[in-house]
From Swiss-Prot:
It catalyses: AMP + diphosphate = 5-phospho-alpha-D-ribose 1-diphosphate + adenine. The keyword Glycosyltransferase applies. Belongs to the purine/pyrimidine phosphoribosyltransferase family. Catalyzes a salvage reaction resulting in the formation of AMP, that is energically less costly than de novo synthesis. This is Adenine phosphoribosyltransferase. GO terms for cellular component: cytoplasm. The gene is apt. Its EC number is 2.4.2.7. It comes from Paracidovorax citrulli (strain AAC00-1) (Acidovorax citrulli). The lineage of its organism: Bacteria, Pseudomonadati, Pseudomonadota, Betaproteobacteria, Burkholderiales. It is found in: Cytoplasm.
């Protein structure tokens, strides 16, 4: 890494794909971060070192479908805490609770097993990217409905111009992100 900060180091491994999935969209592809084991270790360590702090340490890590599973499961393993997936509707086999949220065009629903967390659990909610904040907000509502406290939201990438990080912070959710990108 030489003289680069962790954030600058990770930024150089995030690929920007123009006009995908639609014209005018700059897709931020995190898969290069996962392909090199040294880079992946730096990424995971950036989260793990933060959440080893006693004041921030969660009881459970919850990951949002689908790239939040990759990060969340490894971070939970490293912290020696449980991991729970928050899935798109219809993907979990047991009794679930669900939350519907609005998208730019339409809506989406996420769900969580009803026994995934216990009342009082301190939960870190993690995803790869924060755009509008809708998915993270829905995940938070699910966890809180089950009695857990979401202590912080975390993501690799923040797209602040889309307003999600501002909305989440205004709702009272602290956020930790590693790399900001301008634009959509």
């Amino acid at each position: 890494m030489q003289d680069l900060s962790v954030n600058e180091y990770l930024r150089q491994y995030i690929r920007t794909v123009p006009d995908w999935p639609a014209a005018g969209v700059q897709f931020r592809d995190i898969t290069p971060l996962l392909q090199d084991p040294k880079v992946f270790r730096v990424l995971i360590d950036a989260f793990v070192h933060r959440y080893m702090d006693r004041a921030l340490r969660p009881d459970v890590v919850a990951g949002l479908d689908a790239r939040g599973f990759i990060l969340g499961a490894v971070v939970a393993y490293e912290l020696n805490v449980g991991f729970v997936p928050i899935r798109k509707k219809g993907k979990l086999p047991f009794t679930t609770v669900e939350e519907t949220y609005e998208l730019e065009y339409g809506s989406a629903t996420v769900e969580l097993h009803a026994d995934a967390v216990k009342p009082g659990d301190r939960v870190l909610l993690i995803d790869d990217l924060i755009a509008t904040g809708g998915t993270m907000m829905a995940g938070r509502r699910l966890l809180e409905r089950l009695g857990a406290t979401v202590t912080e939201g975390a993501a690799i990438v923040d797209l602040p111009e889309l307003g999600g990080s501002s909305r989440l912070r205004e709702s009272g959710l602290p956020l930790y992100t590693l790399v900001d990108f301008a634009g959509h």
